[in-house]
Amino acid sequence: MTKPAILALADGSIFRGEAIGADGQTVGEVVFNTAMTGYQEILTDPSYAQQIVTLTYPHIGNTGTTPEDAESSRVWSAGLVIRDLPLLASNWRNTQSLPEYLKANNVVAIAGIDTRRLTRILREKGAQNGCILAGDNISEEAAIAAARGFPGLKGMDLAKVVSTKERYEWRSSVWELKTDSHPTIDAADLPYHVVAFDYGVKLNILRMLVARGCRVTVVPAQTPASEVLALNPDGVFLSNGPGDPEPCDYAIQAIKEILETEIPVFGICLGHQLLALASGAKTVKMGHGHHGANHPVQDLDTGVVMITSQNHGFAVDEATLPGNVRAIHKSLFDGTLQGIERTDKSAFSFQGHPEASPGPTDVAPLFDRFTDAMAKRR
């Protein structure tokens, strides 16, 4: 038997539906994602920490879940909002239905609401703080009060919260269909050593680095530059992650010191924003951010348009770029900056997600650019 659930926004909007996950309360910034598939990858993406994700595609849960599709060791999304939960989860890789998965991971979620109306509110008013209450004896007043009590993501440093606490090595490569697994590559077959700062790294990023010949050492977000340089890396990677980049002063300082060397640097998502801040630019909070797998981005050097996966609520302010940083990619949705490169260093970054998971891999060649830079330095 289903239990009732409420989604309340800080502006007082109320949506009533049914609980499809754990009972209880969750609060966070409510955002919408336009991807048609990949809900498990989205839920386990650390970049969604403290965010309640609304999926605009109406039918979510058709394919169930599988451990192989997780992008981290746990669910990071604060909650899930969907329109319709299919009665049947059908896929040869399915090991657990979506409701079972949500309950097992203690995720509060709601289905059966008008996600189109909700998305219009978020588009017109911007991302809002919200609360999901699920179970018996829930009240609209309590949900609204909880939503208004959430402080918001501006000024919130979440990178050090989601980051690994210990350094570790990574040699698992991209998924293989024939084995339904991610093969481990022998270190002797990986010519490049990359140190990756974990600000909330997705596993498919690490796998794509390995697939291109990189032995990856993952270090905590607060690792000093001196410890990274002592590992003698061929390249340094700055990962994706949640929250506001500006409070991450430890990361900005480490990146500044690494940029004083000639070691190639590549950043994605939060790593892109941190590279910009370390180079003297500024970041801004976006209205409703970019969340989806169908965002067109243009390469400003070639004019080529690529469809990309996006997940960010902050952006680099192009007007603040110093003279030694140039724009190399732009969003064709709103013109916001999507990529930068240093003109005086071997350092570049991309705001979206070249690793996809979920989404298209049009921008995956940026990983090749990174390995090419490491090869050139040798």
Swiss-Prot record:
GO BP = 'de novo' pyrimidine nucleobase biosynthetic process; 'de novo' UMP biosynthetic process; glutamine metabolic process; L-arginine biosynthetic process
InterPro entries (UniProt xref): Anth_synth/Amidotransfase (IPR050472), CarbamoylP_synth_ssu (IPR006274), CarbamoylP_synth_ssu_N (IPR002474), CarbP_synth_ssu_N_sf (IPR036480), Class_I_gatase-like (IPR029062), CPSase_GATase1 (IPR035686), GATASE (IPR017926)
Going by the entry's taxonomy, the superkingdom of the source organism is recorded as Bacteria
Q: Where does L-glutamine bind?
A: S47, G241, G243, L270, Q273, N311, G313, F314
Question: What EC designation does it have?
Answer: 6.3.5.5
Which reaction does this enzyme catalyse, per its entry? hydrogencarbonate + L-glutamine + 2 ATP + H2O = carbamoyl phosphate + L-glutamate + 2 ADP + phosphate + 2 H(+)
Pathway field: Amino-acid biosynthesis; L-arginine biosynthesis; carbamoyl phosphate from bicarbonate: step 1/1; Pyrimidine metabolism; UMP biosynthesis via de novo pathway; (S)-dihydroorotate from bicarbonate: step 1/3
**Does the UniProt entry include the keyword Metal-binding?**
no
The Glutamine amidotransferase type-1 domain covers 193-378
Q: According to its UniProt record, which residues of this chain constitute the active site?
A: C269 (nucleophile), H353, E355
Cite the GO molecular-function annotations of the record. ATP binding; carbamoyl-phosphate synthase (glutamine-hydrolyzing) activity; glutaminase activity
Give the enzyme class.
ligase
Which keywords does UniProt give here?
Answer: Amino-acid biosynthesis, Arginine biosynthesis, ATP-binding, Glutamine amidotransferase, Ligase, Nucleotide-binding, Pyrimidine biosynthesis
User: Region CPSase: start and end of each range?
Assistant: 1-189
Q: Could you say which protein family the record assigns here?
A: Belongs to the CarA family.
Function of this protein?
A: Small subunit of the glutamine-dependent carbamoyl phosphate synthetase (CPSase). CPSase catalyzes the formation of carbamoyl phosphate from the ammonia moiety of glutamine, carbonate, and phosphate donated by ATP, constituting the first step of 2 biosynthetic pathways, one leading to arginine and/or urea and the other to pyrimidine nucleotides. The small subunit (glutamine amidotransferase) binds and cleaves glutamine to supply the large subunit with the substrate ammonia.
Q: How does it assemble?
A: Composed of two chains; the small (or glutamine) chain promotes the hydrolysis of glutamine to ammonia, which is used by the large (or ammonia) chain to synthesize carbamoyl phosphate. Tetramer of heterodimers (alpha,beta)4.
What protein am I looking at?
Carbamoyl phosphate synthase small chain
